[in-house]
Amino acid sequence: MATTDEIIGKTAPSRLVDHNLVDREVESLCGGMVRYEKRPAKRRDGSTAEGLFNAWIVLNNPKQYNSYTTDMIKALILAFRRASVDREVNAVVFTGTGDKAFCTGGNTKEYAEYYAGNPQEYRQYMRLFNDMVSSILGCDKPVICRVNGMRIGGGQEIGMACDFTIAQDLANFGQAGPKHGSAAIGGATDFLPVMIGCEQAMVSGTLCEPFSAHKAARLGIVSGLVPALKIGGSFVANPTVITDRMLDEYGRGVHGDFRTGAAYKEGLAAIKGGEVDLSLLDAAVEELCAKLLETFPECMTKSLEELRKPKLSAWNANKENSRAWLALNMMNEARAGFRAFNEGTKETGREIDFVKLRQGLARGIPWSEQLIDGLIAALLARRSER
């Protein structure tokens, strides 16, 4: 009887059809701010599976916390399409450069300086954004979100579109919408109720309070969690987070909550004095890729298609209406919110005076450029007050 290698040699076609949409390198679309790398796939014993690879799609904009520009979105669409049709690819690893951020969402500088006040332009941008999310949800290969740092706002949305999330435990998660002039309708309002339930989804999507990777794991957004901080040569859990007990004295769940007061400050000091090492994160990602390698490929794809349906159904039902609303919102609240984030500083803060705005709207004032300029001027004036 012929061996498997002999059968492959005799029956493989001499020419393979190229199913890529365009013959362009991913990096050429965005000046290298998205990288596409094929890394050798490995078995569980660490040996290389010859001719098979894992596709790494890497957000490479660390100076802006790996926020995505319009050109980066185009590159991501192409990258996921390329990985999806590549016969040699086992799994996709979606991550960011460095250890500070996986992704913090859209590029607020671009939002504030180009899209604010231009709803017709932002509507076209959101077509690209929607296609990016759909390309993740429609990828024929399992997609692993390697959370190397904070996953916030739109970064949380594209992260939740992935099939698996493995995070280092210094990373924070959360939404930014109503705090910065938007609503989390780029996927979060579709995915969160499915993934963590309506009540917790409401908390995350409206209050926009960041939460720890440990809490993300408790809620069910993260399937794999590893320490990243080394102190004295040994890995330790995130010292700003409660990890040594499940309940407080009243029986309330506190595991994964941030510490407070002096304990939190001590944790920050410990992080500052330690060393960040992502080797355990990489090992966990490789382990998952190896497990995925040892499955029937078409059965894997079908399983992905079926298990994605709850997220995909909600996404497809809402994405076009969301695109229209987000475009129009660029004339008022988004225009103010993104400008505040872009023009504000650590000293002034990056949020407008919400109470003043609400007081004005309660009296029926219309949205105008003058109102927005006034909100920004009041924000910047805080510098002198402080």
Language-model regions: role of each:
Residues 135-154, 158-297:
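Crotonase-fold acyl-CoA enzyme core
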Residues 65-68:
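Short amphipathic alpha-helices within nucleic acid-binding modules
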Residues 50-60, 74-117, 134-147, 164, ...:
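A structural preference for short, pocket-lining loop segments at secondary-structure junctions
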Residues 1-53, 87, 99, 212-214, ...:
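C-terminal alpha-helix plus adjacent terminal tail
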Residues 72-76, 125-128, 281:
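Hydrophobic alpha-helical membrane-association signature
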Residues 11-15, 20-28, 33, 96-132, ...:
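Glycine- (often His-adjacent) and acidic-residue-rich active-site loop
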